[in-house]
A protein has these predicted regions:
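Conserved acetyl-CoA-binding loop-helix of GNAT-fold acetyltransferases
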Residues: 3, 9-22, 45-49, 148-162
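Conserved beta-strand-loop-alpha-helix junction that forms the acyl-donor binding cleft
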Residues: 4-5, 34-43, 62-66, 171-181
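Conserved acetyl-CoA binding element of GNAT-fold acetyltransferases
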Residues: 1-5, 35, 133-153
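Catalytic cores of nucleotide-enabled group-transfer and carboxylate-activating enzymes in metabolic
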Residues: 62, 193, 197-203
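Amide-forming acyltransferase catalytic core, primarily the GNAT-like/NAT-type
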Residues: 49-136
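Conserved active-site alpha-helix within GNAT-family acetyltransferase domains
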Residues: 10, 14-18, 26, 38-56, ...
Length: 206
């Protein structure tokens, strides 16, 4: 959500957010969530004032193209299993049922609307969903490893670097450290300057 400079202080943002919360409650949803850049103190204060609490940090990661070329010289990583879109979404939906606070954008509800063509790999306890479009960075849409050690996620990232060695690889600021972010750090990805927090507000039952 954003507000034009002229609308600041008018109460429009507060009214929109409150309407969103009321509509969600009327549909029987237990909570609502949003993401906010951690460095945006004004927005954080606004959301906290409307009952939202930060529950998770969400980081973004980059791997420049030149670093990817160097990575391609490493020993080849194990071959992941390519899974079709339906199977990948079913796996993610199961994870979403078992693990709380998974950002909406990395789940099937949002991925189903992706315009870029999605490729899905799975290895052990981890799955990665990414897209490759000529002339643009390789984009990771979802990376989840249900094993705290995140070894399989690290192997998937290493394999992605090797296969798309000439491309920049971008993981948007939606990545939880405990579900794949630590693997990105170990694999040499650089953290983006700005990161987000996942904020949640519980709703009262009607």
């Amino acid at each position: 959500m954003g507000a034009l400079p002229d609308a600041r202080g008018s109460g429009a943002a507060r009214a929109l957010l409150d309407d969103f919360v009321v509509r969600a409650g009327a549909q029987g949803l237990p909570e609502v969530e949003l993401e906010c850049f951690a460095q945006n103190a004004r927005a954080l204060k606004f959301y906290q004032g409307r009952g939202f609490a930060a529950v998770r940090e969400l980081r973004g990661w980059n791997q420049p193209a030149d670093a990817s070329r160097r990575a391609s010289a490493r020993e080849p990583a194990p071959e992941p299993r390519v899974v079709d879109r339906d199977a990948a979404f079913e796996w993610l939906a199961d994870v979403e049922r078992r693990i709380a606070d998974l950002p909406l954008q990395v789940t099937p509800s949002s991925l189903a609307a992706a315009v870029r063509p999605l490729t899905c790999w799975r290895l052990g306890s981890a799955q990665i969903v990414f897209s490759v479009v000529d002339g643009t960075p390789t984009q990771v849409h979802s990376l989840v490893d249900t094993d705290p050690a995140q070894r399989d996620a690290q192997v998937l990232l290493r394999r992605l670097r090797a296969v798309h060695a000439a491309d920049e690889i971008v993981i948007p600021a939606l990545q939880r450290d405990d579900l794949g972010g630590d693997a990105a750090r170990r694999e040499g990805f650089a953290p983006q300057v700005l990161h987000q927090v996942l904020m949640v507000r519980a709703l009262e039952k009607p």
